[in-house]
């Protein structure tokens, strides 16, 4: 979809929503913007890994370098601090002082909630409790988890649904959502992950559709546009994954206009999180390019 067609579609949608009386509801979470922009910490994973920047400075970098006031954490950058109240308090203080928001924690290296081994699955569930509590303390709405599994199509649905359902019993008790990203294996198959969502069938369990993470394995890819359509009905967050950009400022692997069309058509009114993962541009440049593209799309509506 080109920009002209996107503008026409967006104008029709926003006009129709206003006439129906639903427009104010759709936009209320975004201060009269069709969507707000957040920054995922993974966008700076190389700098963080090299200790060029400190995790505690992430929110300040988002605000001061990019004008972004909402952040999404990755647990591996403060992996030993989930139960460190002093550290979490410092994180919270810095975000509050900036007038920013903590949205979610992306959780990795804690096991797979769909593990076919009952003991490993139970351990993975338990491993996520501390991150659920940390998310609550920081003011986040969700933790992002991995539902990777093994076995047949149906077996993996049942296993992943079991792990999510059991973890959600804890998350729901303290008001934290449990959301699944398309993150490899069958989780990158939109039809499969949608089936998992239907199987769990709980308002606090949802998806985090990622524009680019539709690689199932090796050279096997799921159609990203079809996948986004299938996952958006359950979305509680969205990741604008980006890699490289052309001379016009467009992302070369994903048609951002087309995907944002899908996102808005689903009635989504939350944050769209920048998640730059490219190698041609520096991380700072990649974040700026992604931010600029999302702003152009937003301003076109």
What residues fall within each predicted segment?
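Short, conserved glycine- and acidic-residue-centered signature motifs
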Residues: 55, 124, 160, 224, ...
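Active-site cleft segment of glycoside hydrolase catalytic domains centered on the general acid/base Glu
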Residues: 150-164
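A short helix->loop->beta-strand "cap" motif at the edges of active sites that frequently abuts
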Residues: 100, 176, 266-270
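Active-site groove signature of glycoside hydrolases
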Residues: 135-154, 179-183
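Acidic/histidine-rich catalytic cores of soluble enzymes
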Residues: 70-71, 164-261
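N-terminal pre-domain/capping segments
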Residues: 2-137, 155, 172, 202, ...
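Conserved active-site loop/cleft motifs that coordinate metal ions or position small ligands
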Residues: 240, 270-277
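Hydrophobic residues within beta-strands of alpha/beta enzymes
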Residues: 71, 103-105, 143, 178, ...
């Amino acid at each position: 979809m080109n920009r002209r067609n996107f503008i026409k579609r967006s104008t029709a949608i926003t006009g129709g929503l206003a006439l129906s009386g639903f427009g104010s509801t759709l936009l209320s979470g975004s201060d009269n913007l069709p969507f707000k922009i957040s920054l995922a910490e993974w966008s700076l994973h190389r700098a963080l890994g090299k200790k060029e920047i400190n995790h505690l400075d992430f929110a300040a970098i988002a605000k001061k370098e990019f004008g972004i006031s909402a952040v999404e954490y990755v647990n591996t950058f403060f992996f030993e601090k989930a139960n460190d109240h002093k550290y979490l308090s410092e994180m919270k203080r810095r975000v509050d002082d900036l007038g920013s928001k903590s949205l979610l924690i992306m959780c990795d290296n804690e096991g797979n909630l769909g593990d076919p081994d009952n003991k490993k699955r139970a351990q993975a569930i338990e491993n996520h409790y501390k991150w659920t509590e940390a998310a609550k303390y920081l003011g986040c709405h969700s933790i992002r988890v991995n539902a990777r599994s093994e076995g047949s199509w149906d077996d993996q649905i049942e296993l992943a649904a079991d792990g999510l359902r059991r973890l959600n019993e804890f998350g729901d008790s303290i008001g934290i959502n449990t959301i699944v990203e398309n993150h490899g294996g069958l989780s990158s198959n939109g039809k499969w992950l949608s089936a998992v969502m239907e199987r769990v069938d709980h308002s606090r369990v949802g998806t985090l559709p990622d524009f680019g993470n539709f690689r199932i394995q090796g050279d096997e890819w799921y159609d990203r546009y079809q996948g986004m359509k299938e996952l958006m009905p359950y979305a509680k967050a969205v990741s604008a994954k980006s890699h490289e950009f052309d001379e016009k400022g467009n992302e070369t692997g994903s048609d951002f206009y087309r995907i944002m069309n899908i996102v808005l058509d689903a009635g989504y009114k939350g944050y769209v999180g920048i998640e730059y993962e490219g190698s041609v541009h520096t991380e700072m440049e990649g974040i700026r390019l992604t931010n600029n593209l999302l702003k152009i799309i937003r301003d076109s509506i």
